Amino acid sequence: MKNLIYTFVGSVTLVLLTGCSAEFENGTPEPWQREINPNENYEYTIKHPCLVNTEADFERARRKVNERAEPWISGWEKLCESRFAQLSYNANPQEEIVRHSQGGNFNTAAFDAGAAYQLAVRWKISGDEDYAKAAVRILNGWAKTCKGVNYKTWPDDSHRLLAAGFIGYQFAAPAELMRDYEGWKTEDFEVFKKWKIGRAHV
């Protein structure tokens, strides 16, 4: 018992002595690389896809996979083994995405959005149109089924803002990859955009 007390007192003393030691010197902040001119017209040209991956990313990935270079080929094989990256994946669109302090069904949306993204990546790298069709099918299903986030269940729960944020982004990522797929009908793409702007956010 005495040893335990001595250990405790010694630990507390060490913490107190450390806390009373001289203050650490501040580091030297790195200067801006260049001065910001408030009158300068800063423009950025969006070149799709650009949310998570660029076309240059996919060109490099395709080349590395075709060369069977590591670690790219191992990563590709892991993706191809994922249950979310299979043509047989069955999405489960919900009328309402719900997140509250007791739980909710938001994971269903997250899983389906993740599957759409993985299928989209398989299409971008392999060129197999079946994966493009599967990804679009998931996106269309949610856009035509889901009417909002916590719009009737727990509408005042602040968790809905979290759901709108991360679920909205997760659906936007595969949609960004699929927007240049000619098989995604213009009218379906417009329905998806309206859903993302008006219903998948709060």
PLM features: residue spans?
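Bacterial N-terminal signal peptides that target proteins for export
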Residues: M1-V9
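Hydrophobic helical h-region of N-terminal Sec-dependent signal peptides
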Residues: G10-L14
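Extracellular glycan-targeting catalytic surfaces
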Residues: F24-R199
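C-terminal motif of bacterial Sec signal peptides marking the signal peptidase cleavage site
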Residues: L17-G19
